[in-house]
From Swiss-Prot:
Coiled coil: none annotated. Its main location: cytoplasm. Redox regulated molecular chaperone. Protects both thermally unfolding and oxidatively damaged proteins from irreversible aggregation. Plays an important role in the bacterial defense system toward oxidative stress. This is 33 kDa chaperonin. The lineage of its organism: Bacteria, Bacillati, Cyanobacteriota, Cyanophyceae, Nostocales. GO terms for biological process: protein refolding. It comes from Nostoc punctiforme (strain ATCC 29133 / PCC 73102). Pfam families: HSP33. Keywords: Chaperone, Cytoplasm, Disulfide bond, Redox-active center, Zinc.
C-alpha cells in the first residue's frame, strides 16, 4: 500500500479526521540512518505525527518542525514535515536498543525519557509560531495529543504505530481525530468517539489485518455522518540538502578555516543529519571558495 494521506469530516463538520500510511518512508529512514528497532519506532511515530499536524496548514510551503528532547538514551528526535507531504528526520542515538516494555512492546517511552516537546509551525511569513509542552509519556502519540489540547485548545485523539520485523518496517502510520468547537458541546458524541478510539488495539494491527484508511475511518466514524475527501495525497521521505548548500555552509567558515582543511585534510566531508547523505569537497573546491571570498572582499572594500 502506497504511503498516503487522506482527510475526512464527520458530525456535520464537527469532527476532523486525518489518516496517514507511512510504511515506505519509515523504512527509508530506517535504512538511511541504520536505526535500531526502538529508534525506528520512535522516529517513525514522530514523522507520522508531523505529517498529520502539517495537514491542517493552509498556505503552500508551510512546514512543521517537531523536536522531542528527552533525557533517555535515544538522545532526542527532530522531524521536519510539510504540507506538501514530504518529511525528514533523525534521532540522536540511532543504535540504541532496549528490552520490551511491560506490555511486551518496543519501549519508545523508555528510550525518549522525560523532557519536552517543541513544535514550530512555519507558514512562510517569516514569523514561525512555536510552542512547548512537557512530555506525558515519551510514547509520542500521548505527547503530541497533549500539545494539541494545551497549545491549540483542540481535543484530539492520536493513534500512531510502527511495526518493525526482521526484514524492516512492514506497517507504519497514524490517525488524528479532532473534535472542533461546534461538536465539543455534544458530550455523548465525544464520549462515544473517545470510547471507540480507546478500544483500538493500535494502528499497525489494523493495517496488518488488511484494512485501508477508508475502512478504518468507516469503522470509527461511519455512523456519524462521515464524509471522506476523494483526494489522496502521496507522502515521501525527502531532504532538500545539496552539494551547493554544503559549499555555502563551508564558505561561511571563512578563509582561515578553509585553508586549514586543505592543509590538514586535503578537503572536507559533511554528513546531513536529516538524511545521512555524505558530501565531499576537494581541496580544489575549497580553494575556489577561498578565491571567491577574496574576490568578494576586494569588491566590498
Amino acid at each position: 500500500m502506497a504511503d498516503q494521506l487522506i482527510r475526512a469530516t464527520a458530525a456535520e463538520g464537527g469532527i476532523r479526521a486525518v489518516g496517514v500510511i507511512t510504511t515506505r518512508l519509515t523504512e527509508e529512514a530506517r535504512q538511511r540512518h541504520k536505526l535500531s528497532y526502538v529508534a525506528t519506532a520512535a522516529l517513525g511515530r514522530t514523522m507520522a505525527a508531523g505529517l498529520l499536524m502539517a495537514s491542517s496548514m493552509k498556505r503552500s510551503g508551510s512546514r512543521v518542525n517537531v523536536r522531542v528532547k528527552g533525557d533517555g538514551p535515544l538522545g532526542g528526535i527532530l522531524v521536519d514535515a510539510g504540507l506538501d507531504g514530504t518529511v525528514r528526520g533523525y534521532v540522536g542515538n540511532p543504535s540504541i536498543e532496549l528490552p520490551p516494555n511491560a506490555k511486551g512492546k518496543l519501549d519508545v517511552g523508555g528510550a525518549v525519557g522525560g523532557g519536552y516537546l517543541y513544535v514550530v509551525r512555519d507558514v512562510g511569513y517569516g514569523y514561525p509560531y512555536s510552542s512547548t509542552v512537557e512530555l506525558v509519556s515519551g510514547e509520542i502519540g500521548d505527547d503530541v495529543a497533549h500539545y494539541l489540547v494545551n497549545s491549540e485548545q483542540t481535543p484530539s485523539a492520536l493513534v500512531l504505530g510502527v511495526f518493525v520485523g526482521a526484514g524492516g518496517v512492514t506497517a507504519a502510520g497514524g490517525l488524528l481525530i479532532q473534535v472542533l468547537p461546534k461538536a465539543a458541546r455534544d458530550e455523548a458524541l465525544v464520549e462515544t468517539l473517545e470510547s471507540r478510539v480507546a478500544g483500538l488495539a493500535g494502528f499497525t494491527p489494523l493495517l496488518q489485518a488488511g484494512k485501508n484508511l477508508t475502512e478504518i475511518f468507516s469503522d470509527l466514524l461511519g455512523d456519524m455522518g462521515l464524509e471522506i475527501f476523494s483526494e489522496r495525497q502521496m507522502l515521501r521521505f525527502h531532504c532538500g540538502c545539496s552539494f551547493d548548500r554544503v559549499l555555502g555552509a563551508l564558505k561561511i567558515l571563512g578563509e582561515a578555516e578553509l585553508q586549514d582543511m586543505i592543509v590538514k585534510d586535503n578537503g572536507a566531508e559533511a554528513t546531513c543529519d536529516f538524511c545521512s547523505n555524505v558530501y565531499q569537497a576537494s581541496s580544489d573546491q575549497l580553494a575556489q571558495l577561498i578565491a571567491d571570498l577574496q574576490a568578494e572582499s576586494t569588491v566590498s572594500g
